[in-house]
């Protein structure tokens, strides 16, 4: 089966580029896992319903399945702040 395509905003590309090499490998492995099986992440609730979150070390990758075979990355960050940051990004959009 063909993997899903990822739509990655420039701000997320830049964040991943600046990560420590070990963490960058983990994030890329997480993204590959999401591309293969988008249901792997935990479904989020309440104001973040429709999004999913995958734990990668101390970081979370927040994403949504946007269309047939397309995944939108929404945010990547530490658990402590990622959900508030995601809400802020969604309200601005």
Label each residue range with its predicted role.
Residues 29-54:
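A short, surface-exposed loop/turn module that caps and links secondary-structure elements
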Residues 13, 45, 83:
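Nucleotide phosphate-binding site architecture
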Residues 21, 33-36, 88:
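Short, intrinsically disordered, mixed-charge
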Residues 1-25:
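Arg/Lys-rich, positively charged N-terminal/basic patches that mediate binding to nucleic acids
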């Amino acid at each position: 089966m063909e993997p899903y395509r990822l739509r990655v905003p420039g701000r997320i590309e830049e964040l991943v580029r600046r990560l420590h090499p070990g963490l960058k490998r983990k994030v890329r492995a997480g993204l590959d896992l999401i591309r293969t099986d988008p249901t792997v992440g935990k479904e989020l609730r309440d104001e973040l319903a429709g999004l999913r979150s995958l734990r990668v070390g101390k970081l979370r990758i927040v994403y949504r399945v946007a269309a047939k075979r397309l995944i939108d990355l929404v945010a990547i960050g530490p658990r402590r702040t990622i959900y508030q940051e995601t809400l802020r990004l969604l309200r601005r959009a």
